[in-house]
Amino acid sequence: MTDSVVVEGYARLRDGKKWKTRWLVLRKPSPVADCLLLLVFKDKSDKVQGNKERLSATLEELCGLEVGPWYEGVAFTLAILCLTQTTLLGFDSKEALLAWDARLRYSLGEVHRFSVGVLPGTKLESGPATLHLCNNLLALARDVPPVIVGHWNLPDLRRYGPVPNGFVFEGGTRCGYWAGVFLLASVESEQISFLFDCIVRGISPTRGPFGLRPVLPDPSTSETSSEERLNHETLELEKRLSMLSHRSSTASYCPSAGGDDRSISGSSDTSDTSHSDCSVGSRLTIWTEPTSIQPENLGNAGAKAAAQSAEKPLPSGQGGGSQPPTKPPRQLQEIGRQSSSDSGIATGSHSSYSGSFSSYTGSLDSNTGEDYGSVFSLPPHLGQDVRPCTCLNVPGHEYQIPTSLRYLYDTPRSVLQEVGGDTKDNQPPAALGPTTEPAEGDKRSPGEGHLATADGDSPNEHFRSPSESKKSSEAPSGGHPGSCCFKTIVTICAVCGGFKVS
């Protein structure tokens, strides 16, 4: 169809007392015309070949469109109402009827219809009727096929408005014979009044923004193609529903062996070899509120946790089977306080010890003389989880810490005892190792440890000269037994998660 063609297709046209199927074309003489040109061809081939139409008619002073019921052997009818004539078209399917109606309405502009009842006391005969509004033209029609019984121009009306259970309007002197007050019974009086207000003010309430054409139905689709389209849409909907049900079945829940209902199953109902993995529930971490447990109450808290785990029954034990007791869930602490085994940091290297030392001890400014890195100085929550290693020591299978990097991690100043000045004076020159002069800066050999003054230094020691403070801060490399403190290194077993002390 071209731009001037409104709608075309096969339809039944009333010819005397018979219905004849013809190829009909409804077009506008110009894009701004308020009339329609009806062209009748015997077949579609005549239109394609460019043959002259068999009948042509101009439909002027259009008042509206009315979809009618069965009429003389035709199931669906569409009446094109004009002031002087009515053109009645017949269709075999409701889809074709609605397609023609939608295209004609969009082409004509503001076309509306309402079922009303004419009340007595006016020039019109009382009874049911249809109120048609086509742009500025208002008309009342009745009977089958419909016939115009009254018409008015909207600019010629004196007043109009809704009333309880009805709509009233008054025609002025320009309306001629149809001047006067007319009262219609309708439940859509507010909608009628709204449309009157919009059309009188030049507003199109049913049109979108300029240049946007809605998707109009195709009138050439047959009943068979409509059924195929409906079947295709039904199949697509069933396919989407089956996909949604399949996705929902993959997220089913099942209880774990320890009664933990938070375990997630990865099974699918559509697979014959599907299986549920309920062991995830034993690895799920239980989030608890941080509590402040004193170190002296650490043993009591561990005993309570063991008693609670022992009192919890196992469902599998009721069936006669025996399973090893499940490992108590580890408790997550706040950020920066998790152990190196949880954070994935490898143990036994210089970088891992220096990077995770604060996570084990919680803070470096603790009491003097604490054994850093040991299980006794860990935070309370971590102390409950760490246990001694129970693995057998097999030569060659255990990672050995390199000797050159064994004591190179940063040692807190509160661990090492203050080295007296007499110890430094009594040391032999060979024990000092590769100690450099003050002018050489901060160079140190890999074998010496970094010693700092204790927290209880006197004010005189803080005001020493740079050379004296540097000499007093350097420690021996381990040759003198009285100048070196005992260092405890704690490693975490990669197999069982226990700690080893070396």
From Swiss-Prot:
Residues 264-279, 301-316, 347-358 have a biased composition (Low complexity). It is a peripheral membrane protein. GO terms for cellular component: plasma membrane; synapse. Residues 210-232, 249-279, 291-358, 418-482 are annotated as: Disordered. Keywords: Cell membrane, Lipid-binding, Membrane, Synapse. The keyword Cell membrane applies. Residues 459-473 have a biased composition (Basic and acidic residues). It is found in: Cell membrane; Synapse. Residues 4-109 form the PH domain. PROSITE patterns: PH_DOMAIN (PS50003). Residues 336-346 have a biased composition (Polar residues). The keyword Amino-acid biosynthesis does not apply. Signal peptide: none annotated. GO terms for biological process: neuromuscular junction development. It comes from the Eukaryota. Its main location: membrane. Residues 105-210 form the IRS-type PTB domain. Probable muscle-intrinsic activator of MUSK that plays an essential role in neuromuscular synaptogenesis. Acts in aneural activation of MUSK and subsequent acetylcholine receptor (AchR) clustering in myotubes. This is Protein Dok-7. It comes from Takifugu rubripes (Japanese pufferfish).
